[in-house]
Curated annotation (Swiss-Prot):
EC identifiers of the protein: 5.3.1.23
Keyword vocabulary terms for this entry: Amino-acid biosynthesis, Isomerase, Methionine biosynthesis
Encoding gene (name): mtnA
GO biological-process terms attached to the record: L-methionine salvage from methylthioadenosine
InterPro entries, per the entry: IF-2B-related, IF-M1Pi, IF_2B-like_C, Initiation_fac_2B_a/b/d, M1Pi_N, NagB/RpiA_transferase-like
Family in the record: Belongs to the eIF-2B alpha/beta/delta subunits family. MtnA subfamily.
Native organism taxonomy: Bacteria, Pseudomonadati, Pseudomonadota, Betaproteobacteria, Burkholderiales
UniProt site positions, description: Transition state stabilizer: 165
Organism: Albidiferax ferrireducens (strain ATCC BAA-621 / DSM 15236 / T118) (Rhodoferax ferrireducens)
Protein's UniProt name: Methylthioribose-1-phosphate isomerase
GO terms assigned for molecular function: S-methyl-5-thioribose-1-phosphate isomerase activity
Catalytic residue positions: 245
Keyword DNA damage: no
Length: 354
C-alpha cells in the first residue's frame, strides 16, 4: 500500500460536493464509514456539537464551511437580510463547542473576509466566503505536513509512541497533527509502532486512532487508559505525541481528558511528551490553562452506550471533555514553524514575531 495515496491519510474528513458540505460521521466508525450532508450553519453546528466531526482543526474547517453554506443559502437575499442571516450563522457556530480555539480562529478569518467585501454584491461575497473556506482547509493539510516533517525528526527508528485520543487525519482536513508526526516518520522509512489509549468515554483512541493505523499497516496496540503507567514503568514507551485543542499564552495545553495524567506519568518515567500544535491552536488571549473554558458533556456518555447501561441509575457524573497539562510537563511543542522546546510565554510569543 502506498501510504501517501491510500487509507485515512488520503481520506477527506470534510469535502465540498455539489454545493454542500459532506463530513465523515465519526460517531459510527469503525463499524460504518459514511458521509453525512450539511447545507446550513445550524446543521454544521449540530454536527460539531454531536461529534459527527471532532478534533480542533477539523472543527475549524467545518465552521468555515458552515459560514459559507449559510451565505450560499442567502445568495438571493437583500444586503440587509444577508447580513442578518449571516450573523445568525456565525452565532450558532460559535456556540457549538467552547474549548477548541480553531473554531473561533476560523470564524474570525471568515468574518474578516465578510468585513473586507461588504461593499460588493451579495453574490460576490458568497464566492469570497466559499473560497476562504476552501483555503482554510487546504492550509490545514499543508500545515499538518510541515508539522509532521519537524516532528518525525524527534522519533528514533524503532520508537514505540503512545498517543491519546485521535489527532489524525480524521481530526483535521488531512494527514493529522500527532498522527501526522507518526505518518511522516513512517513515510521517511522509520519503523514506528503506536500505542493507542482507548480514551474514555468517547473512545476516540479505540475507534478512530486504531482504525487509522490499521488501515495503513502501521503497527498499533490498543490499551485502556489506566494501563499507560504500567507500560511506561516497564520501559515499553519511548515517546508520547498528542494533539491539542487550545494552548494558552504561557504554554499550558488543553487536550482530551486524560492527557494530563499521561503527561505526569511521562515526567515520572523520563519519557518525552510532545504536543503537535498548529499556530492556529495557540490562543495568546488566554493567559494560562486556568482560563481555558472546559466543556462538560452529557452524563450518558459515561454511564452507558445506547441501550446498554453499566452505571447505577441515579449516580452523579462528571464528564469534562478536556483537561489542562501545565507547560512544565511539555517537552516541546511541534509547530509548522519548528520545534519549540520547553514552551513558555516568551518563546511562544516569539513564534508569532517571525
Amino acid at each position: 500500500m502506498n501510504r501517501q495515496d491510500h487509507g485515512p491519510a488520503a481520506v477527506q474528513t470534510l469535502r465540498w460536493r455539489e454545493g454542500r458540505l459532506e463530513m465523515i460521521d465519526q460517531r459510527v466508525l469503525p463499524a460504518r464509514f459514511e458521509y453525512l450532508p450539511f447545507t446550513s450553519a445550524a446543521e454544521v453546528a449540530e454536527g460539531i456539537r454531536s461529534m459527527v466531526v471532532r478534533g480542533a482543526p477539523a472543527i475549524g474547517c467545518a465552521a468555515a464551511y458552515g459560514v459559507a453554506l449559510e451565505s450560499v443559502q442567502l445568495r438571493g437575499a437583500t444586503r440587509e437580510a444577508f447580513a442578518v442571516g449571516l450573523q445568525r450563522g456565525f452565532d450558532v457556530l460559535a456556540a457549538s463547542r467552547p474549548t477548541a480555539v480553531n473554531l473561533f480562529w476560523a470564524l474570525a478569518r471568515m468574518r474578516a473576509v465578510w468585513d473586507a467585501n461588504q461593499h460588493r454584491a451579495v453574490g460576490d461575497i458568497v464566492d469570497c466566503l466559499l473560497a476562504q473556506a476552501h483555503e482554510i482547509s487546504a492550509d490545514d493539510v499543508r500545515i499538518n505536513r510541515a508539522m509532521g516533517a519537524y516532528g518525525a525528526a524527534l522519533l528514533a527508528d524503532g520508537a514505540r509512541v503512545l498517543t491519546h485520543c485521535n489527532a489524525g487525519a480524521l481530526a483535521t482536513a488531512g494527514h493529522g497533527t500527532a498522527l501526522g508526526v507518526i505518518r511522516s516518520a513512517v513515510q521517511a522509512g522509520k519503523r514506528i509502532s503506536v500505542i493507542a489509549d482507548e480514551t474514555r468515554p468517547f473512545l476516540q483512541g479505540a475507534r478512530l486512532t486504531a482504525w487509522e493505523m490499521v488501515q495503513e499497516n502501521i503497527p498499533v496496540t490498543l490499551i485502556t487508559d489506566n494501563m499507560a503507567g504500567h507500560l511506561m514503568s516497564r520501559g515499553e514507551v519511548d515517546a508520547i505525541v498528542v494533539g491539542t485543542d487550545r494552548v494558552a499564552a504561557n504554554g499550558d495545553v488543553a487536550n482530551k481528558i486524560g492527557t494530563y495524567m499521561v503527561a505526569v506519568l511521562a515526567q515520572r518515567h523520563n519519557i518525552p511528551f510532545y504536543v503537535a500544535c498548529p499556530l492556529s491552536t495557540i490562543d495568546l488571549a488566554i493567559p494560562d490553562g486556568a482560563a481555558i473554558p472546559i466543556e462538560e458533556r452529557a452524563a450518558e456518555e459515561v454511564t452507558g452506550f445506547r441501550d446498554c447501561q453499566w452505571a447505577a441509575k441515579g449516580v452523579q457524573v462528571r464528564n469534562p471533555a478536556f483537561d489542562v497539562t501545565p507547560a512544565e510537563l511539555v517537552t516541546a511543542l511541534i509547530t509548522e514553524r519548528g520545534v519549540l522546546r520547553q514552551p513558555n510565554r516568551t518563546t511562544i510569543a516569539g513564534l508569532f514575531a517571525t
